[in-house]
Each structure stands twice: as C-alpha cells, then as structure tokens.
Amino acid sequence: MQLRNTPHRYGIISIGLHWIFALAVYAMFGLGLWMVTLSYYDGWYHQAPELHKSIGVMLMMGLVVRVVWRHISPPPPSPKTHGKFTRVSAVAAHIALYALLFAILISGYLISTADGKPISVFGLFDVPATLSDAGVQADTAGVVHLWLAWSVVILSVLHGLAALKHHVIDKDDTLKRMLGRSSSDSGA
C-alpha cells in the first residue's frame, strides 16, 4: 500500500489518520461523559480531566498534521457514479467535521486554561494559558464544548452511515477506499 493517496484509493497515512481520529474522538467523548459523573472523592476525579486535556492537545496537533497532509496528498475524487448532491454533501460534511473538531479543541483549551494555569501534556510539556478569565470563560466554553461534542458524534455517525449506504446499497468503492482496498484500482 502506498503512503500517498491515489485517484482510486486513500494511502496508508490518510487511512491511519482517519481511523486514529475516529477512535480517539469516540474515546474522548466517552471519557468526557464519564468524568463529569465522578464525585470529588473518586480516585479518577483529578486524573480523568488531566488525561482528557492531554489527549485533546495531542488531537489538536494531529488535526493540524491531518489538514497539512490533506493538502500534500489530496483525497481521491468522488466516484463518477455519485451525483452532484452526493458530492456537495460529502464536501460539506468533511468541512463541517474539520471545523467542529477545531472548535471543540479550542473550546476545550478555553475551559482548561480559564484559571490561568497551563495544560500539562502527560507531564512532558506545557501549553500556556494565553486567554484566561476565570469568570465565565470556563462555564461558557463548557456549554459550547458539550454541544460541539454531541455535534461531532452525530455528524460522524451520519458520515459512517453514508459510507455504509454507499457500500451496501450503492455497491460502490467509497468505504473500500478508506479501508485501503478498491476494486477499480487494478491491484496498485
């Protein structure tokens, strides 16, 4: 399998980034839902948010890499069997997912740094608090973060259902390409 995308399939880097992000986003969603249920006396009360913040910073760095990679190695064009509505919807959904991911990561940063303290990333390095206002910043960003998280999950579920629809009903290569296979790509 090639590193870069071809006209018929995604390369291993794009596929890896896609699935790592899919797993990480759902893991972060689950971690976020779980950590807000913890009581002060729970052993994970302080550890879970620190883990959530560290992974969030890593995801922001990964998202920048992903956007840069998308420009270096553009995705394959939509199959010719896709109509205009399908092509426009796919582009809009991808733009929305990227925008939502950036927004959720920024809102997480605003929650985490509202008290003026940096974010320690697994104890390896700190991300400084550049915008901090302990007043309403954390609460406002928290509400935004929650709504964005649900939006990402809902849109990504629709994204997955669309891929399954293409695979099962339309019987095209949309899903196969993101799995590293394509019947229209003569073995390359």
Which residue stretches match the model-derived regions?
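Membrane-embedded alpha-helical bundles that constitute the cytochrome b-like, heme-associated redox core
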Residues: 1-188
